[in-house]
From Swiss-Prot:
Regulator required for centriole duplication, for proper bipolar spindle formation and chromosome congression in mitosis. Keywords: Cell cycle, Cell division, Coiled coil, Cytoplasm, Cytoskeleton, Mitosis, Phosphoprotein. Its main location: cytoplasm. InterPro entries: SPICE1. The modification Phosphoserine is found at S640, S644, S760, S764, S819. The modification Phosphothreonine is found at T235. Residues 325-437, 725-751 form a coiled coil. The gene is SPICE1. It comes from Homo sapiens. This is Spindle and centriole-associated protein 1. It is found in: Cytoplasm, Cytoskeleton, Microtubule organizing center, Centrosome; Cytoplasm, Cytoskeleton, Microtubule organizing center, Centrosome, Centriole; Cytoplasm, Cytoskeleton, Spindle. Interacts with CEP120. GO terms for biological process: cell division; metaphase chromosome alignment; mitotic spindle assembly; regulation of centriole replication. One of its GO terms (cellular component) is cytoplasm. Residues 312-328, 794-828 have a biased composition (Polar residues).
Length: 855
């Protein structure tokens, strides 16, 4: 690489041109976005402008006016003797207290308005309310918590209501004026004396006025006369001051401070010339015009020196001409003002009901001062009276608040008591509602039990049973046979009745020794001791429960008295081990008693008597053997609960209903006993009719006996209580059924007569099996009990009596002693020779049939 100098100035040959630099495109300036940087939103509204103007207006015009007077007086006091200082000082304090209070009050009100406007959110509005507060009965704390006032509010109130607040404001303003004036220490001491003088209370100020009023006025007048005399000696007789009268001088007294201030200002400029008093007075009365002239003079100082003689002459001439009118107008204004004050005082006195004092005529400044002082005295007196009245009102208010607090506590206590009573009432209503529900349930269950429990009785039989008749004979017609009420009772029934304690029986039984077989039961026992002859399906003993006394009596009745052929039902097979399970512990009996009672009430249904004889003879039968007697004796103590177990558990207040139900139960038991006697009497009468026929009519007599007994006998579960309406209906139905039974009995008697005429003995459609009773053999008692859960189709279907399931319950030889057939034999051996002998034995032992049971 070679370094060759090349001439830059020469032409470039073969040199490649440099590419032009591209200029950057200037970005287009965006337009002014008024929505983002618009400052018109910050422009002051007209209301803001007005408020700013009001804020920046000068409010010290009157203060400046008094400041000028004070400065002039201070300069004068330094030159005068100390004797006159006290007089001028008092005069100045009086003028300040009388004339400057209005301006100071306005300033104080403005400041207080600003303070209240700034602090109005600290004290929100409070509304009196009566809260619904309930206090506990034993609480010592009050129901309403009183909120204490904030600390700021109390401080603010103390600062506003402080009596020295106005004077403090005056002192601050005067202190600022003195600091701006820059006078000597004597002036500061004088200001302090003025401040202390202005800070005196109103009462002390009034006392000073009353003591020194006359002395002060006399000194003022002497001072004024001396000034007039000195000025008249100095000035020539042709000056306008000679035209001034005493009234004009009095008019100028209100502006004495301004006059002295102007004199002190004009003395260095016109030391050689004397100033006319008329000019000074005109300057004071027309302060605005004089200020404008002074401003013009300050702007043109050269012209001011040349025009001084002309100005003095012209101003003196104008003021001398207008002075009487101005002084008169000033006095009129003062008189008008004092008249307004006295008029306002008079209206206030009328409004408050005080004595109205007449207007006082004032002449000059003396009357003006006296009227003001008297008005102030009256105002102070009225303020004292209003303060006393306000204190009385405050005391009365406190007393009323205390009484109100007592009343509120009483109201809270009453409210708590009312709430407690409401709670008790609600609890009582809940218990009453529950009691009503349980009562309704009991009534419903009782109604169902009554509907399922017909009573076969009439009023004549009730009266006969109550009178204690043991036997009766019913004679419907001369053709009808006599019904004998003397019937025999089986030994088994008598033995088990004797086994029951007296208090455990549902109906009180008279315990008598066992009568012989040939004695009549009606003569030994009352009518109401017999249990009803019922056709009830006994409950299946599926558990180890024991029967209640009433249920046990009904069960024994079914066991000891076999029934003849009955209407169509479902056969129920009972096994002997079900009855032997009763010997289990008593605890299981207590635990399952409710289930057993429920099964007992559900399975024992009411029989209906209106079925035909053909349907009655088609029902299958169940042969139930009698359980062992020793099992009864072993479990007698476990099966002896009180009769109250049969009743439902009653709630509070149902003792009366319990008594009524017991009375009705006793009445029903008496009716059942009467029906049993009637049934036995009818059977006995039928047996008496059938016995003369001999052995050839055994089967037919058995059939007739079964049919008549099934027609005339009606059994049902014992109801707890019956309503009067249903009782009347039941009695009417039972009377009707009794008439039907009697009609059927007559038909059977006629059939017996017809059968007796026939030579060939009729055979019974259903043969009773013969059983041989030996000492070591087993016994069998046939009892036909229809099933409680038979379907309705069994009424229409024809079932052969032979096809019925016959079950035999056998017991060991130990039960022979309790057998109703073996109870009378000493050796325990009894073997019936033929069916007739067996039937006769059954008639002697008091066998009776169970009525039909139709589900």
């Amino acid at each position: 690489m070679s370094f060759v100098r090349v001439n830059r100035c020469g032409p470039r040959v073969g040199v490649r041109k440099t590419p032009k630099v591209k200029k950057k495109k200037t970005s287009v300036k965006q337009e002014w976005d008024n929505t983002v940087t618009d400052l018109t939103v910050h422009r002051a509204t007209p209301e803001d402008l007005v408020r700013r103007h009001e804020i920046h207006k000068s409010k010290n015009r009157a203060l400046v006016h008094w400041e000028l007077q004070e400065k002039a007086l201070k300069r004068k006091w330094r030159k005068q003797k100390p004797e006159t200082l006290n007089l001028e000082k008092r005069r100045l304090s009086i003028m300040k207290e009388i004339l400057s209070d209005q301006y100071q009050m306005q300033d104080v009100l403005e400041k207080s308005d600003h303070l209240i406007a700034a602090a109005k959110e600290l004290f929100p509005r409070r509304r009196t309310g009566f809260p619904n507060v309930t206090v506990a009965p034993d609480s010592s704390q009050g129901p309403i918590v009183v909120n204490q006032d904030p600390i700021t509010q109390s401080i603010f109130n103390e600062s506003v209501i402080e009596p020295q607040a106005l004077n403090d404001v005056d002192g601050e303003e005067e202190g600022t004026v003195n600091s701006q004036s820059g006078e000597s220490e004597n002036e500061n001491e004088l200001d302090n004396s003025l401040n202390s003088q202005s800070n005196t209370n109103t009462d002390r100020f009034l006392q000073q006025l009353t003591e020194e009023n006359f002395e002060l006025i006399s000194k003022l007048w002497t001072d004024i006369q001396q000034k007039i005399a000195t000025q008249s000696q100095i000035t020539p007789p042709g000056t306008p001051s000679s035209a001034l009268s005493s009234g004009e001088q009095r008019a100028a007294l209100n502006a004495t401070n301004a006059v002295k201030r102007l004199q002190t200002r004009l003395q260095p400029e016109e030391s050689t010339e004397t100033l006319d008093s008329s000019y000074v007075v005109g300057h004071v009365l027309n302060s605005r015009k004089q200020k404008q002239l002074l401003n013009k003079v300050k702007r043109k100082p050269n012209l001011h020196a040349l025009s001084k003689p002309k100005k003095n002459i012209s101003s003196g001439s104008t003021t001398s001409a207008d002075l009487p009118n101005r002084t008169n107008s000033n006095l009129d204004v003062l008189k008008h003002m004092i008249h307004e004050v006295e008029h306002e005082m008079e209206e206030y006195e009328r409004w408050t009901g005080r004595e109205v004092k007449g207007l006082q005529s004032s002449q000059g400044l003396t009357g003006f001062t006296l009227s003001l002082v008297s008005s102030l005295c009256r105002l102070v007196r009225y303020l004292k009276e209003s303060e006393i009245q306000l204190r009385k009102e405050v005391e009365t208010r406190q007393q009323l608040e205390q009484v109100l607090g007592d009343h509120r506590e009483l109201i809270d206590a009453l409210t708590a008591e009312i709430l407690r009573l409401r709670e008790e009432n609600a609890a009582t209503q809940a218990r009453l509602q529950q009691y009503m529900v349980t009562t309704d349930e009991q009534l419903i269950s009782l109604t169902h039990a009554i509907k399922n429990c017909p009573v076969i009785n009439n009023r004549q039989e009730i009266q006969a049973s109550e009178s204690g008749a043991t036997g009766r004979r019913v004679m419907d017609s001369p053709e009808r046979p006599v019904v004998n009420a003397n019937v025999s009772v089986p030994l088994m029934f008598r033995e088990e009745v004797a086994e029951f304690p007296q208090e455990e029986l549902p109906v009180k039984l008279s315990q008598v020794p066992d009568p012989p077989d040939n004695m009549n039961l009606a003569k030994n026992f009352p009518a109401h001791i017999f249990e009803p002859a019922v056709l009830l399906t006994p409950p299946r003993q599926k558990s180890n429960l024991k029967f209640s006394p009433l249920q046990d009596v009904l069960r024994r009745t079914v066991q000891t008295r076999p029934a003849p052929r009955l209407p169509p039902t479902v056969e129920i097979i009972e096994k002997e081990q079900n009855w032997e399970e009763k010997t289990l512990p008593i605890d299981t009996d207590i635990q399952n008693s409710s289930e057993e009672n429920r099964l007992f009430t559900q399975r024992w249904r009411v029989s209906h008597m209106g079925e035909d004889l053909e349907n009655k003879t088609q029902a299958p039968f169940v042969n139930l053997s009698q359980p062992l007697c020793n099992s009864h004796s072993n479990t007698q103590q476990s099966r002896s609960p009180t009769f109250s177990e049969e009743l439902p558990v009653l709630g509070d207040g149902q003792q009366l209903r319990t008594n009524e139900s017991l009375i009705q139960r006793k009445d029903i038991m008496t009716r059942i006993a009467d029906l049993t006697l009637q049934n036995s009497a009818i059977k006995a009468h039928m047996n008496n009719i059938i016995e003369p026929r001999g052995e050839q009519g055994d089967g037919l007599r058995e059939l007739n006996k079964q049919e008549s007994a099934s027609d005339m006998t009606s059994t049902f579960p014992v109801a707890q209580s019956l309503t009067p309406g249903s009782m009347e209906e039941r009695i009417a139905e039972l009377n009707r059924q009794s008439m039907e039974a009697r009609g059927k009995l007559l038909q059977l008697i006629e059939q017996q007569k017809l059968v007796g005429l026939n030579l060939s003995p009729p055979m019974s459609p259903v043969q009773l099996p013969l059983r041989a009773w030996t000492e070591g053999a087993k016994r069998t008692i046939e009892v036909s009990i229809p099933g409680a859960e038979a379907p309705e189709s069994s009424k229409c279907s024809t079932v052969s009596p032979v096809s019925g399931i016959n079950t035999r319950r056998s017991s060991g030889a130990t039960g022979n002693s309790c057998s109703p057939l073996n109870a009378t034999s000493g050796s325990g051996r009894f073997t019936p020779l033929n069916p007739r002998a067996k039937i006769e034995k059954q008639n002697e032992e008091g066998w009776f049939a169970l009525s039909t049971h139709v589900s």
